[in-house]
Each structure stands twice: as C-alpha cells, then as structure tokens.
Amino acid sequence: MSIKSDKWIRRMAEQEGMIEPFEPGQIRYDSNNQKLVSYGTSSYGYDVRCAREFKIFTNVHSAVVDPKNFDEHSFVDISSDVCIIPPNSFALARTVEYFRIPRSVLTVCLGKSTYARCGIIVNVTPLEPEWEGHVTLEFSNTTPLPAKIYANEGIAQMLFFESDEICDTSYRDRGGKYQGQTGVTLPKT
C-alpha cells in the first residue's frame, strides 16, 4: 500500500471527480489578501475545508450520549462562518468537499497542526473504498477555554493510500449506512 502524490490527487480529482469542489494548489489567502488556514492539494494529501453547518453538544435536555439510541436534542444547530466550541466540549461539521473514493483506495484523515496546537482535535474515521459523500468532521476542544473553528478554511488533511490488490467487498458493495451522506450526519446503527 503506497501513499499517493499531489500529481495523482490532481489527476483523480480532475478526471474522475474524486474531490468536488477541487483546488489543485494550496490556498493561503482569501480574495481580500487576508490569511487563511490553508486548504487544497499538498505534496501527499488534500487539505479539506469545513462548511458553515455545525452541531455543538449541549446539555440543555440532560441527554445521555448513546450511539445506539442517539438523541438529536444533544446538539444545537448553527450556520455561521465561525463556530465557538465550549471548553472541554465537542462539535460536528462537514467538509465543503464531496468525495468519491476509488475501489483500490483507503483515505485517512489527520488534523492540521494549526488547530492541534490550539488543543482542537479533529477525528474522522477512514473513508473506505467506494465510499462517497461529504465527510462528517468531529472536533474535540480539549482546552478549558472556548475554541474557534473557521468555516471555508482548511481544517484537516486527507491522505490517500492505494492497495496493491483490489478489495473483494467495498463500502458500496456492503451497502454502508453512511454512503452518499450530505450535510452533518449523526450516528446510525
């Protein structure tokens, strides 16, 4: 299994629609020349952006977090250019980009150092072969202070690994429950 380069990522995005919308280079400034948390193609990965749709955990309804019986009232929905995550709390968002993962590829997501150095941890489970959709992003604010996430700026990096052998059964073949997801998707069983 080998990691894929910027050249491969560009080719797959432009010819196969693997990432939409796609940025072939690294974007570091907005149209007003203001600094951004970078996004776009890097040497061996793709830095994704966070969309404007967020779900922030709240304890207003005294709900218990149960992945088998998830209560939607555990979250407050926010649509904004920024999201303030309360101290020691958690939020969900989604990528701006829609992914179509090839059958021979497994994609792993890692947080960006800009956020990690502020105590904001990004967690995403692997994007399996032939999975497609917007990626639901999970953020943990590990600090005792409120933390800010910026929409439409870089938030995490996707790394693409291609296997030497095609899998027998892909995520699509299994009828995976998160196939084709759009928007911030809550837990399913």
Swiss-Prot record:
Q: In which pathway does it act?
A: Pyrimidine metabolism; dUMP biosynthesis; dUMP from dCTP (dUTP route): step 1/2
> What Gene Ontology molecular-function terms does this entry list?
dCTP deaminase activity; nucleotide binding
Q: Could you name the active-site residues?
A: E138
Any keyword Hydrolase?
Answer: yes
Hydrolase recorded as keyword: yes
Instruction: Write out the residues that bind dCTP.
Output: K112, S113, T114, Y115, A116, R117, T136, L137, E138, Q157, Y171, Q181
In the record, the note on similarity to other proteins reads: Belongs to the dCTP deaminase family.
HAMAP family from the entry? Answer: dCTP_deaminase
Its name, as the record gives it, is dCTP deaminase
